[in-house]
Amino acid sequence: MAKVKKICIAKNSGDKMEDVNQIEVIANKGIVNDRYFKDNNESDLQITLIESENIDYYNRISNSQMPYINFRRNVITREIELNNLVSKHFFIGEVKLLGIRLCDPCKYLQDMLKDKSLVKKLINRGGLRCEIISDGKISTNDIIKII
């Protein structure tokens, strides 16, 4: 069953990500207390997801033990293929989201994690950028359901 494994936010850009058990989200704005929260927010900046299995894959091929939180995505999932959710509506708990586009790994993340081949290793495995359609709360262990 697809679930939320971990939730992370950062209050300001560049801050270390903070592990939290629950977030409040507001449609078209983002995650309350997160660095990208603002009125009329761009749809692909509101919330990001990544599969725990892809982080595990990265750690395996890199012979590392990089914590999930270091990948700078808001919601770490398990047992769901996020790439299939582009242009699809789905729920995390009570919150309705729309998959906007893949969240490809970037040089910023590569530099933060000090791995010159991170972008190459995580192509098509970097997660999903989503628009928040309905207000609500997302918690660790919430069920993810495709509509």
Cite the ranges covered by each PLM segment.
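Metal-cofactor-dependent catalytic cores
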Residues: 1-147
